[in-house]
Swiss-Prot record:
Name the UniProt record assigns to this protein: Spore coat protein F-like protein YraG
Predominant location category: other
Signal peptide extent: none
Cited InterPro entries: Ferritin-like, Spore_coat_CotF-like
Family the entry assigns: Belongs to the CotF family.
Location within or outside the cell: Spore coat
Gene Ontology BP term (one): sporulation resulting in formation of a cellular spore
Keywords on record: Sporulation
């Protein structure tokens, strides 16, 4: 399939995941400054690198897929006349 389209709920889910991964990267980088155990620092750095790779892949999906949110032609019925 050459042209991929995301439904509205998929676009929202993808946006939430990208935001979450971005916050995880920021938190891991921040916490590395508070950790003294080198083994834990190495593990946290590995987590940051993996999260950056995951985020790059998610951003590629985000850029490649178009978003489709159909707008209904009919107007809602007014509650009050």
């Amino acid at each position: 399939m050459d042209h991929q389209t995301l439904a509205a709920h998929e676009a929202v889910d993808l946006h939430e995941i990208v935001n979450f991964k971005t916050l995880c990267i920021a938190k891991s980088k921040l916490m590395q400054g508070l950790v003294f155990d080198q083994e834990l620092k190495d593990l946290m750095e590995k987590d940051v690198q993996q999260s950056i790779q995951d985020l790059t892949e998610l951003q590629a999906v985000y850029e490649r897929a178009s978003f489709q949110a159909p707008v209904p032609q009919s107007r809602p019925t007014p509650i009050i006349n």
